[in-house]
Amino acid sequence: MDSQPQSKKAARGADKTARNPIPIIPAPTERLPKPQWLRVRSPLSPEVDQLKKILRDAALHTVCEEASCPNLGECFGGGTATFMILGDICTRRCPFCDVAHGRPEAPDPLESVHLARTVASMKLRFVVITSVDRDDLRDGGARHFAEVISALREHCPELHVEILVPDFRGRVANALAAFRETPPDVFNHNLETVPRLYLQARPGADYHHSLQLLAAFKAQHPQIPTKSGLMLGLGEEIDEIRGVMRDLRQAGCELLTIGQYLAPSRHHLPVARFVPPEEFQQLQRDGMAMGFRHVASGPLVRSSYHAERSFHEIGGD
């Protein structure tokens, strides 16, 4: 019998994190209980089922499903989603993330058209496009992003597009060149955590490189808002988070999301603590005082949560 390829489930769990520079010790069966403020309703509803059917018929993936987002029920129930392009297999092993690791397939040349037609059929006004890391591609997948933006604007002229990009490690010049003629309405790249925790939480990434990516895009497109996101609960100190926020402002970043980290499984990074809503509220005030144009900070906030609202609140047309 022929051997079967590694399953997505295996690539998500212990096999994914086993080779990280800082090993993940599986958490005990009993983990920190979720506080009441983190409890969300089940994502099972007719609206959710209908949107999943539309996505499957178009052979599309959403980060809402792949990353086990706690807001899936709310977003899908409202008929919206953040679309994930370039497949659902990542070349990185970030131990906080529930997206599968492995060897991805070649990009689908028809994906941009399929996605644009799907968005048009859903009559969406604002979409977020993200992707897995594609270290196997010369430009990290940037040209594919640009093709998707072009197709979306062709099929949906009134649509606004936010992209949430990987770090394009070692490929920044090629990546930014791809967006020169086809920039998004919002450029988002998440720093995720504080520099001290990068080796543990983002092996293969570099804090200063990510800052430089945001700064370089802003230098080329000063009129386009840049955005980043942070997770709390990995063992950081609040003053470290404030330091990252100041670094982001120096890089020209204008929009910020801050949310609670939730471990996808016992094989992922454990939650060090559940941050109370009051601390998120204080960080929101701190961020606005630093000069961010919009800060979404709360336990259930994720990078693309209410992305359309933040875009319009800062004057996006």
From Swiss-Prot:
GO molecular function: 4 iron, 4 sulfur cluster binding; lipoate synthase activity; metal ion binding
Gene Ontology cellular component list: cytoplasm
UniProt KW keywords: 4Fe-4S, Cytoplasm, Iron, Iron-sulfur, Metal-binding, S-adenosyl-L-methionine, Transferase
Cofactor note: Binds 2 [4Fe-4S] clusters per subunit. One cluster is coordinated with 3 cysteines and an exchangeable S-adenosyl-L-methionine.
Cofactors (names): [4Fe-4S] cluster
Catalytic reaction list: [[Fe-S] cluster scaffold protein carrying a second [4Fe-4S](2+) cluster] + N(6)-octanoyl-L-lysyl-[protein] + 2 oxidized [2Fe-2S]-[ferredoxin] + 2 S-adenosyl-L-methionine + 4 H(+) = [[Fe-S] cluster scaffold protein] + N(6)-[(R)-dihydrolipoyl]-L-lysyl-[protein] + 4 Fe(3+) + 2 hydrogen sulfide + 2 5'-deoxyadenosine + 2 L-methionine + 2 reduced [2Fe-2S]-[ferredoxin]
Cross-referenced SMART domains: Elp3
Annotated binding of [4Fe-4S] cluster 1, by residue: 64, 69, 75, 304
Claim: 4Fe-4S is one of the keywords in the record: yes
Cross-referenced InterPro entries: Aldolase_TIM, Elp3/MiaA/NifB-like_rSAM, LIAS_N, Lipoyl_synth, rSAM
Pathway: Protein modification; protein lipoylation via endogenous pathway; protein N(6)-(lipoyl)lysine from octanoyl-[acyl-carrier-protein]: step 2/2
A Pfam entry, by short name: LIAS_N
SUPFAM superfamilies according to UniProt: Radical SAM enzymes
EC number: 2.8.1.8
Top-tier EC class: transferase
Localisation per UniProt entry: Cytoplasm
Residues noted as binding [4Fe-4S] cluster 2 in the record, renumbered to the chain: 90, 94, 97
Ranges for region Disordered: 1-28
Residue intervals of the Radical SAM core domain: 76-293
PANTHER family cross-referenced by the UniProt entry: LIPOYL SYNTHASE, LIPOYL SYNTHASE, MITOCHONDRIAL
Family listed: Belongs to the radical SAM superfamily. Lipoyl synthase family.
Full protein name: Lipoyl synthase
Lineage: Bacteria, Pseudomonadati, Pseudomonadota, Acidithiobacillia, Acidithiobacillales
